[in-house]
Amino acid sequence: MIRWRKGEVVRVRREWPGAVELDVAVAEGECRALAYPPLVGRPEVGDTVLLNTTALAMGLGTGGYAMVVAVPDRLPQDPSGPGHLVKARYTPLQATVLGADEQGSPHHEALREADSVDGMPVVVADLHSALPAILCGLYADSPGIRVAYVMQDGGALPAWFSMSCATLRQRDWLCGVVTTGQSFGGDVEAVTLHTGLLAARHVLGADVAVVAQGPGNLGTGTRWGFSGVASGEAVNAAAVLAGRPVAALRVSEGDRRERHVGVSHHSLTAYGRVALAPAQVVVPDLPGGFGAAVREQAAALATRHEIVTVPVDGLHEALKASPVRLSTMGRGLEEDLAYFVTSAAAGRHAASLLS
């Protein structure tokens, strides 16, 4: 289950808020490692570190790091301050954080009786890589709005893993990150997706929320065995809180796997079977035979949801202006334009709901 190694830090490669990327010498040679200073302290060159190297052994893409579990000879100081929410519960790295709605929080009163997000558009996506593309579509038509990212716990648990999130926060493309469930490290911590959406609205003052898992999609190639099934649950959560769910389809023209070409089977299952509340499903007006195939596939969702066709003019240019690199499953903007345009179209539609 876990491959353990002891190593020595030989260099710091780069860092961003909440994370440090390192080169570590182990018995087999050097490996790339990632440390989260809020959990283990900041490793320095020469430090001995304990590593979990399972991801390296598996050859994972997004998560292909050795993970620093401890800096045993230089432990960080004990944390101070309030906080009673335990996340990554009953694991060796379980962490205590301050929940937005717990009694020690300054936001407790605002959230104690909160039961609605007041019609806020909630864009739901399967993959983390859709987040910046959705933002490109939102800001192309509605610059200056406040957008919160509500992170589910189906992928990476620490929000710090996402370099995109760090950059989007620094560029003010996000007014904040809300980490829900077992995920942690956001500007605001929440127990459930429901309290996360309420916090996005009433704590961060978001005009729009984008809900997606963190980096590192999990899937088995079966109908039900993928972490993105939670996107259907997010539609239900948004609806029960009087939000306006906007479903972003996962569409690809560049994926070599047939089940993900056109409208991914992930979207058809999550929105067609799991989402019990109606949503507005955004279908981009893509040209040619591929666009026609996408529209035909998406039509299967019309029995429960409203299909909204959105023009895509100008979205390619908007995507080129993204402050972060666009990549999904190793494919960039030009390698799978349909994927990113589809996500941006969902953002464009959400922006139209604000007027």
Segments the model singles out, each with a brief description of its role:
Residues M1-G119, A133, S142-R146:
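Extended, charged alpha/beta regions that create polyanion-binding interfaces
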Residues T48-T53, H305-S355:
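Extended hydrophobic packing segments that form well-structured cores
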Residues W4, P37-E44, A125-S129, A133, ...:
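Conserved active-site and cofactor/substrate-binding residues in soluble primary-metabolism enzymes
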Residues V177-L197, H202-V203, A209-V310, L315-E317, ...:
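A structural signal for small-residue-enriched, beta-sheet-centric alpha/beta enzyme cores
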Residues R5-R13, G155-S162, Q170-Q182, L319, ...:
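A cross-family phosphate/adenosyl-ligand binding-site feature
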Residues L60-G61, G144-I145, P245-R250, R256, ...:
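Flexible, glycine/charged-enriched surface loops at secondary-structure junctions
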Residues A95-A190:
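Phosphate-binding glycine-rich loops and their immediate beta-loop-alpha structural context
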Residues C31-L34, D47-V49, M120-V122, I145-Y149, ...:
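Structural motif
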